[in-house]
Amino acid sequence: MNKQVIFGLLLACILVCISGQDEEDYQESPTVLIALLVRNKAHILPMFLSYLEQQDYPKERIAIWLRCDHSNDDSIELLRQWLDNSGDLYHSVSYEFKPEEQSFVNGTSPYEWPASRFKHLIALKEEAFQYGRDIWADYVFFLDADVLLTSKDSLKVLTRLQLPIVAPMLISESLYSNFWCGMTEDYYYRRTDEYKEIYHVKKQGSFPVPMVHTAVLVNMNHRAVRNLTFDRNKLVELQKSRQQEPLYDGPADDIIVFAISANSSGIPLHICNDITFGYILQPLEPGDTLDHDVQQLVNLKSIMVNELGAVPPLLDYYKHLEKKPEKSKLSLDRIFMINLKRRPERREKMERLFDEIGIEAEHFPAVDGKELSTERLLEMGVRFLPGYEDPYHHRAMTMGEIGCFLSHYNIWVMMVRKQLKEVLILEDDIRFEPYFRQNAVRILNQARNAAQYDLIYFGRKRLKEESEPAVENADNLVHAGYSYWTLGYVISLQGALKLLAAKPLDKLIPVDEFLPLMFDRHPNKTWTEAFPKRNLVAFSASPLLLYPIYYTGESGYISDTEDSQQISVETSEEGEARLKSDREQVFDHEQEFKLNPELKLGESLSKSHQEL
């Protein structure tokens, strides 16, 4: 073949390869103006600013527009510190602080929204919008200080979508987020099935919605963007000029006006859940206090540990401001967390959780089923309940299940030996519900006042067909029915004595089968007859206070009981197996916990009218 032909073919191949590469590799990143409005956010600013600065986006392509007024905390001082240390990293910074202004006219609380506050906020957002136009920014990112963008890719992912208006979906302690999937005719939040599908990432991508707020990226290169506004009067004038009917007659609320102005201009709003962008605090109500926001932050940190492995670190010059709650035993004698020596990552994660939510727990070494043998069990005097087989697998006990039982058994023995009156036993693969500490103490007080108890489930898997009557004179306790899992439970000294008196090592079965036998709610009558004295008084928190981190089939799920070696006994033929860690039989309504009535977060409505 001719050398020129060969050279031509090679050149063509090279050009094809180059043209196939992402165009963005040869272009500057879009310029972004980040508009920040701050008021009384000193408790969250170190996290907010740290995660903002840690964005993997060229800072020379970012301009900052920052305003802070009407604050009576250290917000301005923290912002000045950030600008002194990091301001020069950005293309430009426009800021204005007004320390002399500390409250709004007719405002009785920092969390109240009088008309004067709305008017002021709208004027500032309009000013930020115009500033973005003046500096020819490609995007304006309106970002509230209640947002924690823990993903370093947030800004990069959002700008690459090239949508006219898009918001990153943010996670809260509840179902609250920064978007609506439905809006009523009078401009209030409307519940939809799609909302939960997006929030729980049952479907993934970018979806058109009628409302986004709190963290909103606007593409300034979109032609119709010039018509966007936060001002109700400007919106009405725009509608009149276009002869649009009906004219907007809703509240002078910045986020609602913005959404309607986008709709009037034919600009779609999108919410994106492609990645876990970060987290959001729910807006507070006039009667709330700073403690409510601080507790929300504790809850979000707990979620971060579960989802990210740890709370992302602060900037070095803010680390001295990091605060953790004082640790508590929840009015109990001891709290134990059972953990296998060969699972140090679980122990580390749980200890981070205890640090973040303020739990004084002790590590309790688990008995490892991998280190057990038939000979060792005989030496210990362990015998198995004749005829036992797993209800769903139709198999004998596994060494992992034996180790699990012995771990719990050892704590019961210790309780009796040390005369511990009340103990909380936790496993190492759990997540705590929001306000765990407050609600745990509340439930314990209810149990103590209502009746003498032996055991209280904090987390379990109950069966749907079980009837569970409420405990008299208790708001959040039921008489426990047949349940799986021993994720977390409180046991009294009297309860430990009853369990040990049954001599369970003489007729061993898994611990989560043994407990229902002892409070006489087990459906297998043959096994029940093996334990004649079944007088354990067992309650359950309702709703539950903790759940598993993972369920069967989910990424990250590991079982040290179900997947271990079985003991050698005959069982019946196999039927259809269902793992005890299957999500299917967990009650959906138990996910919505009744919060401490003093907190009132569960029944409040946000500034944006979104139901929780």
Swiss-Prot record:
CDD domains from the UniProt entry: Glyco_transf_25
Any one GO CC term of the record: endoplasmic reticulum lumen
Domain of life of the native organism: Eukaryota
Residues annotated as signal peptide: 1-20
GO molecular function: procollagen galactosyltransferase activity
Location(s), subcellular: Endoplasmic reticulum lumen
Residues bearing glycans: N106, N227, N263, N524
Predominant place of localization: endoplasmic reticulum
A GO biological process held by the record: protein O-linked glycosylation
Motif (Prevents secretion from ER): 609-612
EC number: 2.-.-.-
InterPro entries: Collagen_mod_GT25, Glyco_trans_25, Nucleotide-diphossugar_trans
Gene3D superfamilies documented for this protein: Spore Coat Polysaccharide Biosynthesis Protein SpsA, Chain A
Keywords assigned: Endoplasmic reticulum, Glycoprotein, Glycosyltransferase, Signal, Transferase
Family: Belongs to the glycosyltransferase 25 family.
PANTHER family, per database record: GLYCOSYLTRANSFERASE 25 FAMILY MEMBER (PTHR10730:SF53), PROCOLLAGEN-LYSINE,2-OXOGLUTARATE 5-DIOXYGENASE/GLYCOSYLTRANSFERASE 25 FAMILY MEMBER (PTHR10730)
Record protein name field: Glycosyltransferase 25 family member
Organism: Drosophila melanogaster (Fruit fly)
